[in-house]
From Swiss-Prot:
Stored PANTHER family: NICOTINAMIDE-NUCLEOTIDE AMIDOHYDROLASE PNCC, NMN AMIDOHYDROLASE-LIKE PROTEIN YFAY
The organism's place on the tree of life at top rank: Bacteria
Organism of this sequence: Citrifermentans bemidjiense (strain ATCC BAA-1014 / DSM 16622 / JCM 12645 / Bem)
Protein name in UniProt: CinA-like protein
InterPro entries according to UniProt: CinA, CinA-like_C, CinA_C, CinA_KH, Competence-induced_CinA, MoaB/Mog-like_dom_sf, MoaB/Mog_dom
Entries under Gene3D superfamilies matching the protein: 3.30.70.2860, CinA-like, MoaB/Mog-like domain
Pfam family, one: CinA_KH
Similarity remark: Belongs to the CinA family.
Length: 414
């Protein structure tokens, strides 16, 4: 089954808004056994929308369309759909009833501008929208069933799950499967070298590299009938890349770390400087993190490091705030203040200013202290302020993950 996606909106083409809808649709279709063959983005222009619908309708079995169903003058999708389908707009009493009931719950009265959302292509089939004013609809254009949904992500996602996917799933001929391996701490070229010969020539398994800074994802795909080949290839890649593999499929670094912390029974405290609370935000993003995360300190200034973590002022004066000595003192102070089993600290120069020849922008120190030891390491990251902060945060999480894995597999610990 050939499926296309059409995204509508000036804001998508100007770069003001990232088109997360198209990505979500493609992802959910793939999980359901289908695959998007084409994706077009067009502006809020009736002629451009109608032309794209005609083109996609001639080459696809189904077209999933998002955007342009609102109440404002630039919402032209219904008009363009009617034109491409060779019909006209008519006032849908069912859509108008939905609008009035929705307005009564929210504001008590339907705004006159919203009435235009009930003008839909004649003979279309409606798609319920329990979360918003804009009902979706289905019309036949060319040889394709075209499914129209609003561009508001949480509305579109609900409609996709409850109406569109159930209708399309039974029409996929050969379902697709995939395995996503998530890596950190290795470059693409090094991955390619490690994987040489891992997937034999002629294998039905497809391999794609996807960089999602600071992670690299390896995506293996195959049809359902070739699932044994897919699992065999995934197993080979896991073995070759085990030193860098932190999660698979929908699991994130946060989830993996949460699992390890729960299994360890250890508690954690943080002391952050250049990351400004980013590490704590990632850890607490997982529900139930209060079972192991006690507290986080954002000690940005030298005075705060001394006042909150008892880092001696003379130590900062002698070695600088960005130093192994201060990172160690921050971790020790955080552990003592919280009464935790572990404490992780970070101090660094994110830029764009503050660097020196000895400690250029991107210099970061991480420290991890437990009951019997303290490990400190210096890193030299590249990039602008956002990239330095992002990779510092991720490195800290990965550092903690590796510590917990080592502790788990070391006899006499855990």
């Amino acid at each position: 089954m050939r499926v296309a996606v059409l995204s509508i909106g000036d804001e998508l083409l100007s770069g003001e808004v990232v088109d997360t809808n198209a990505s979500h649709i493609a992802d959910r279709l793939f999980q359901a056994g289908g695959r998007v063959e084409r994706h077009l983005t067009v502006p809020d222009d009736a002629e451009a929308i109608a032309s794209a619908l005609t083109e996609l309708g001639a080459r696809s079995d189904a077209v999933i369309v998002t955007g342009g169903l609102g109440p404002t003058p630039d919402d032209l999708t219904a008009e363009a759909a009617a034109r491409a389908a060779g019909t006209e707009l008519e006032l849908s009493s069912e859509a108008l009833d939905h609008l009035e009931r929705f307005a009564q719950r929210i504001t008590g009265e339907l705004h006159p501008a919203n009435r235009r959302q009930a003008l839909l292509p004649k003979g279309c089939r409606l798609i319920p929208n329990p979360l918003g004013t804009a009902l979706g609809f289905v019309v036949r254009i060319g040889q394709a069933d075209c499914f129209f949904m609003p561009g508001v992500p949480y509305e579109m996602e609900r409609m996709l799950e409850e109406t569109v996917l159930p209708e399309l799933t039974g029409r996929f001929e050969a379902g697709w499967q995939r395995v996503t391996l998530k890596l950190f701490g290795i470059a693409e070229a090094a991955i390619a070298e490690l994987l040489e010969g891992a997937i034999p020539e002629g294998s039905p398994v497809q391999l794609a590299y996807c960089v999602k800074f600071p992670e690299i994802h390896l995506i293996l795909r195959a049809t359902a009938s070739d699932a044994p080949f897919l699992q065999q290839a995934a197993g080979e890649l896991r073995q070759r890349l085990s030193a860098y593999l932190f999660a698979e499929d929908r699991e994130e670094m946060d989830d993996r770390l949460a699992l390890l912390l729960r299994e360890s029974g250890l508690t954690l405290a943080l002391a952050e400087s250049c990351t400004g609370g980013m590490i704590a935000a990632r850890i607490t993003a997982v529900a139930g993190s209060s079972a192991y995360f006690l507290e986080g300190n954002v000690t940005y200034s030298n005075e705060a490091k001394t006042r909150m973590l008892q880092v001696p002022a003379p130590l900062i004066a002698e070695h600088g705030a960005v130093s192994a000595e201060v990172a160690r003192a921050m971790a020790v102070g955080a552990r003592e203040a919280a009464g935790s089993d572990l404490a992780l600290s970070v101090t660094g120069i994110a830029g764009p200013d503050g660097g020196t020849p000895e400690k250029p922008v991107g210099t970061v120190y991480l420290a991890l202290v437990d009951q019997g030891s303290c490990r400190v390491e210096r890193f030299n990251f590249q990039g602008d302020r956002d990239r330095v902060r992002s990779i510092t945060c991720f490195t800290a999480l990965d550092w903690l993950r590796r510590y917990l894995l080592t502790r788990k597999t070391t006899p006499g610990r855990g």
